[in-house]
Amino acid sequence: MKFLKRGVALALLAAFALTTQPAQAYEKDKTYKITILHTNDHHGHFWRSEYGEYGLAAQKTLVDSIRKEVAQEGGGVLLLSGGDINTGVPESDLQDAEPDFRGMNLIGYDAMAVGNHEFDNPLTVLRQQEKWAKFPFLSANIYQKSTGERLFKPWAIFTRQDIKIAVIGLTTDDTAKIGNPEYFTDIEFRKPAEEAKVVIQELNMNEKPDVIIATTHMGHYDNGDHGSNAPGDVEMARSLPAGSLAMIVGGHSQDPVCMASENKKQVNYVPGTPCAPDKQNGIWIVQAHEWGKYVGRADFEFRNGEMKMVNYQLIPVNLKKKVTWDNGKSERVLYTPEIAENPQMLLLLTPFQNKGKVQLEVKIGSVNGLLEGDRSKVRFVQTNMGRVILAAQIARTGADFGVMSGGGIRDSIEAGDITYKSVLKVQPFGNIVVYADMSGKEVVDYLTRVAQMKPDSGAYPQLANVSFVAKEGKLTDLKIKGEPVDPAKTYRMATLSFNATGGDGYPRIDNKPGYVNTGFIDAEVLKEFIQQNSPLDAAAFTPKGEVSWL
C-alpha cells in the first residue's frame, strides 16, 4: 500500500522526460500522519433527511471529532469534496445552494471539484457561489472558448505537517452533453485525463509538491467499463504514469467505492462494514456514495517521500435501516452509533430550512401507490414516474407522444399526499417544456437515434405513447398511440429544452420549423397535472412492455 513520490510524473510523454526533484521541507526519516476526508455528490442535502439521516450538522460533529483525534496524534487533515453541491433538494435549489456552501465553510472544507450539476445554473450563479465559499472550486479542464483561459483554478496547494500537497480538480467532459446546452455557448470541457498529464507536469516543474491528489467529478466504473458515459477515474488512473497521483477523490457515479475483488465493487455495500478502496496503477481511488451519507477517511503515513495508506473507512452519518419486528411493526434503526448535530451548524442552517418550508409543504394532490423515480430504475427501464411526467407534458402541449432522458428524473413519489416539494425533488432542473411537429419519417429517424441511448446512463429514454422493438440499431413495429407510424403524417412530440438542444446527446430539434418553446417550467407543468388529476392511480401509468431492446 505504498506510493513512491517522484520528482516529476515519470515521463508523462516522451516530451516529459526532464525530471526535477521536489524542494523538501520534511525531515528525513520522520513519519508524518496525514488524513484525507472526503464527500461527494452533496446535491443540496444540507439538512437531515425525514428519517434523521446525514445533513451538515451531524457531518460537522463527525469531522470536528476526527480533526481533534488526528491533531492529538500530531497529524494533519485535508477535507475535499468531489463536487455536485447543487441540485436535488428544493430548499437548497430555491436558494442557489447558499445554505450548503455556508455550511461547508463552517465544517472547514479545503477544496472541491467542479461537478457537472454546478452548471444546472447560469455561470453568474456559480460565480456567486464561489463568493459564498471560503474554499476554491477546482477544475483544470474547463476553458472559456473565446479566450482559451481556464474558468477555474486548476489546482490548490496545501501544507500539512511540513508536507506540501497539491490538489488537482477535474470535471467529466460529459458535462457538455448532460448539462444544459444553453449555458455552454462559450465553455469547453477538455479531456480530463489529458489535462491531468499536463497539470502534473506543470506542478512538478514549478510547485514541486511532495504529494499530488486529484479531486474529480468523473465517475468510477468497474474495470474502466464506462459504457456510454465519458471515461472516469479508473481509465484516467491507468492512463497516467504509475503512482503519479497518490489518490483520486471521486464523485459523479454516486457509488460507495468498496471493492469486493479486483476491478469489481461490492454490489450492496452495508454501512459500517469494512470498505476496501480501489487501486489502479499505484493510485488509490475513493468515493463516498452521495448526499453526505458517508464521510470517507483515508489515513496515510508519509516518510521519506513515500505515502502509505494505513487505514480507510466509510463512516456512515446516521444512516438507518428499516427493521420489521415479530409483532409486524417496523422502524428505522441506526447502523452505527448516533452522531449528534452541531448546535452552531443548526443555528446557521435553520433560517434557510424554514425559509422555503412553508411553500413547499402545501399539499397539491395525492397518489394511491409508488411513482418510481429511483436512479436505479429510470436509467434502466420504463417507469410509471416517467409516464406521469410525460403525460403532463403531452397534456400541456397537445402532443402525440413524449420523450425525455431518464436521468432528468431525480426522485420517486411515495403513496399518499403529494406536495410541491415532492414535485421539485423529481424535477429540480427548471427545464422548459417544448414540442416539435415532425413528419412520420422524421419521427422514425429521431426515435431510432434515441433508442441507441444505453441503459445505465442518464441518456436512457423514458417514453410515452410510443412502442417499438429495438435490435442492432434498428426499430421494428414502431407505433405512436398504438398505430403504425405514417411517414407522410405530422406528429407532435413533447420533450424538454434540455433534450431539444442536444442534451445527453439527443438529436437537436430546436432548429426545426415546427419547434415551439412553451416557456412553461417542467416542475410547474407536473404540479398542475397532479392538481388536475388527483387522486392519481399509480397503476394506470405502469408501463406494459411497449418498448423493448433485444
Swiss-Prot record:
<keyword id="KW-0547">Nucleotide-binding</keyword>
<keyword id="KW-0732">Signal</keyword>
<dbReference type="GO" id="GO:0000166">
    <property type="term" value="F:nucleotide binding"/>
</dbReference>
<dbReference type="InterPro" id="IPR006179">
    <property type="entry name" value="5_nucleotidase/apyrase"/>
</dbReference>
<dbReference type="Pfam" id="PF00149">
    <property type="entry name" value="Metallophos"/>
</dbReference>
<feature type="binding site">
    <location>
        <position position="217"/>
    </location>
    <ligand>
        <name>Zn(2+) 2</name>
    </ligand>
</feature>
<feature type="site" description="Transition state stabilizer">
    <location>
        <position position="117"/>
    </location>
</feature>
<feature type="binding site">
    <location>
        <position position="43"/>
    </location>
    <ligand>
        <name>Zn(2+) 1</name>
    </ligand>
</feature>
<keyword id="KW-1015">Disulfide bond</keyword>
<feature type="site" description="Transition state stabilizer">
    <location>
        <position position="120"/>
    </location>
</feature>
<comment type="similarity">
    <text>Belongs to the 5'-nucleotidase family.</text>
</comment>
<feature type="binding site">
    <location>
        <position position="41"/>
    </location>
    <ligand>
        <name>Zn(2+) 1</name>
    </ligand>
</feature>
<dbReference type="GO" id="GO:0008253">
    <property type="term" value="F:5'-nucleotidase activity"/>
</dbReference>
<feature type="binding site">
    <location>
        <position position="429"/>
    </location>
    <ligand>
        <name>substrate</name>
    </ligand>
</feature>
<keyword id="KW-0574">Periplasm</keyword>
<keyword id="KW-0862">Zinc</keyword>
<dbReference type="Pfam" id="PF02872">
    <property type="entry name" value="5_nucleotid_C"/>
</dbReference>
<dbReference type="GO" id="GO:0009166">
    <property type="term" value="P:nucleotide catabolic process"/>
</dbReference>
<feature type="binding site">
    <location>
        <position position="252"/>
    </location>
    <ligand>
        <name>Zn(2+) 2</name>
    </ligand>
</feature>
<feature type="binding site">
    <location>
        <position position="84"/>
    </location>
    <ligand>
        <name>Zn(2+) 2</name>
    </ligand>
</feature>
<keyword id="KW-0479">Metal-binding</keyword>
<feature type="binding site">
    <location>
        <begin position="498"/>
        <end position="504"/>
    </location>
    <ligand>
        <name>substrate</name>
    </ligand>
</feature>
<comment type="subunit">
    <text>Monomer.</text>
</comment>
<dbReference type="InterPro" id="IPR036907">
    <property type="entry name" value="5'-Nucleotdase_C_sf"/>
</dbReference>
<dbReference type="GO" id="GO:0030288">
    <property type="term" value="C:outer membrane-bounded periplasmic space"/>
</dbReference>
<feature type="binding site">
    <location>
        <position position="116"/>
    </location>
    <ligand>
        <name>Zn(2+) 2</name>
    </ligand>
</feature>
<dbReference type="InterPro" id="IPR006146">
    <property type="entry name" value="5'-Nucleotdase_CS"/>
</dbReference>
<dbReference type="InterPro" id="IPR029052">
    <property type="entry name" value="Metallo-depent_PP-like"/>
</dbReference>
<feature type="binding site">
    <location>
        <position position="254"/>
    </location>
    <ligand>
        <name>Zn(2+) 1</name>
    </ligand>
</feature>
<keyword id="KW-0378">Hydrolase</keyword>
<dbReference type="GO" id="GO:0008768">
    <property type="term" value="F:UDP-sugar diphosphatase activity"/>
</dbReference>
<feature type="disulfide bond">
    <location>
        <begin position="258"/>
        <end position="275"/>
    </location>
</feature>
<dbReference type="InterPro" id="IPR004843">
    <property type="entry name" value="Calcineurin-like_PHP_ApaH"/>
</dbReference>
<dbReference type="GO" id="GO:0046872">
    <property type="term" value="F:metal ion binding"/>
</dbReference>
<dbReference type="InterPro" id="IPR008334">
    <property type="entry name" value="5'-Nucleotdase_C"/>
</dbReference>
<protein>
    <recommendedName>
        <fullName>Protein UshA</fullName>
        <ecNumber>3.6.1.45</ecNumber>
        <ecNumber>3.1.3.5</ecNumber>
    </recommendedName>
</protein>
<feature type="binding site">
    <location>
        <position position="84"/>
    </location>
    <ligand>
        <name>Zn(2+) 1</name>
    </ligand>
</feature>
<feature type="signal peptide">
    <location>
        <begin position="1"/>
        <end position="25"/>
    </location>
</feature>
<comment type="function">
    <text>Degradation of external UDP-glucose to uridine monophosphate and glucose-1-phosphate, which can then be used by the cell.</text>
</comment>
